[in-house]
Structures are given as C-alpha cells and as structure tokens.
Amino acid sequence: MLDHVGIPVSDYTRSKGFYLRAFAPLGYDLVLEVSSKETGGHSHAGFGTKGRPQFWIGSGKPIIGSVHFAFMAKDRTAVDAFYAAALKAGGKDNGPPGLRPHYHANYYGAFVLDPDGHNIEAVCHLPA
C-alpha cells in the first residue's frame, strides 16, 4: 500500500547513525542521501533494500508527539539483533523481544524509542 514514509528529526546526524546501526540486523541500508544543498534546505537519508529507499528521515522540526513504525524482520533472531543494536545505538527500551499473542500466535516483536521518541518496532510473523 505505501511506497515510502518519512519523518523529520531533531538531530539529523545522530538519527542517521541510530538508524544505520538499528537497521543493519534487518538488512536495511542507507540507499540514498540528499544534502541540504541539493534540496535547498533540509538533508534527507533514505533507508531500504536493493537501492529503493522506503523509510526517510530528514533534518527539520520534529512532529509533535510520536509515531510508530514496524519493520519486517526475516526471523526472530533478526528481531533480537535489531533490539540489541538499537539499544546500543542509543535507543530506549519500549518492549523487549517476545511473542505478542494478543495480535496473533506468531507475532514476535521488539520495540525501541528512537532519539526523537518515535516507537520503532521490528516484527516477524513466522513461527519459530
């Protein structure tokens, strides 16, 4: 349904570093970066796979309140690795890796708050 999403961040360099480290276990890379010189105002970093940016961060005034994004993980080990990497990168725990049977029997997710307080999740829907 969605092609890509983007959010403004309060500290572009800090957030770019956070997402680079947090996304590595999920196989997501920085696939495109656009400088403020190119846009005439804000820097943007696009993360995704196979050269296709699907999640963007941009320098600017953060939105009021937080948002929640769930990123697909290939397996439960990747969810665990995302959680550890995101915490090491400066994220804050918002729910450790584990089953969330109130969603469905195989819902395995982990939640971390990014540097701006957004709820970032890695999720796997496959059985163990």
Model-found features: residue ranges?
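N-terminal beta-strand motif that seeds the catalytic metal site of vicinal oxygen chelate
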Residues: 1-16, 69, 126-128
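Short beta->alpha transition motifs characteristic of CBS
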Residues: 5, 104, 111, 123-128
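Core segments of cupin and vicinal oxygen chelate
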Residues: 8-52
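Vicinal oxygen chelate
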Residues: 9-14, 70-115
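Conserved catalytic-core motifs of GNAT/GCN5-like acyltransferases
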Residues: 29-33, 98-100, 123-128
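Long, continuous compositionally biased terminal/linker segments
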Residues: 40-81
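Short glycine-/small-residue motifs
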Residues: 66, 121-122
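Conserved Rossmann-like nucleotide-cofactor binding loop
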Residues: 118
